[in-house]
Amino acid sequence: MSDVLRPYRDLFPQIGQRVMIDDSSVVIGDVRLADDVGIWPLVVIRGDVHYVQIGARTNIQDGSMLHVTHKSSYNPDGNPLTIGEDVTVGHKVMLHGCTIGNRVLVGMGSILLDGAIVEDDVMIGAGSLVPQNKRLESGYLYLGSPVKQIRPLSDEEKAGLRYSANNYVKWKDEYLDQGNQTQP
């Protein structure tokens, strides 16, 4: 196991095909990365006290931190962190014990707290705060601290969610092809 991929107790990261994890990032414990995931520079993903699951073609951009919530008498089930497919997580985002659907864009510098649920086809503007246990309904732009539903997404914006994820897969493949990064 490399310095990038680290066990926690008897929990080891599980990595799909064509995954890129930048050498400056760290993935610890029960973390499950599906095919074509891109983990960019300076990302921390800790699946130590619960699991982290990241769906296919999702990208986690530079400086983001992903963690989970442990099981306790206060929260008997804890909160894993689950991220769907074709998701773009912008630079310096913090995700903690939340659930993100498919085709979501989480804007740069946003914070999503324990128990938050983001349905499919959602755009979260940069610098937003999604409070604990808040649900963001499918098909809308959300913005603010705390987030507010701003307006429905246009068809072009919805198509842009998938475009963003596909574009990052292309860039990830270019990095892998030129040898700047290696697959773990």
Curated annotation (Swiss-Prot):
InterPro entries attached to this UniProt entry: Hexapep, LbH_gamma_CA-like, Transf_Hexapept/Carb_Anhydrase, Trimer_LpxA-like_sf
A Gene Ontology molecular function term of the record: zinc ion binding
One cellular component term from this protein's GO annotations in UniProt: protein-containing complex
Pfam families, alphabetized: Hexapep
Family per similarity comment: Belongs to the gamma-class carbonic anhydrase family.
Protein name: Protein YrdA
Organism of this sequence: Escherichia coli (strain K12)
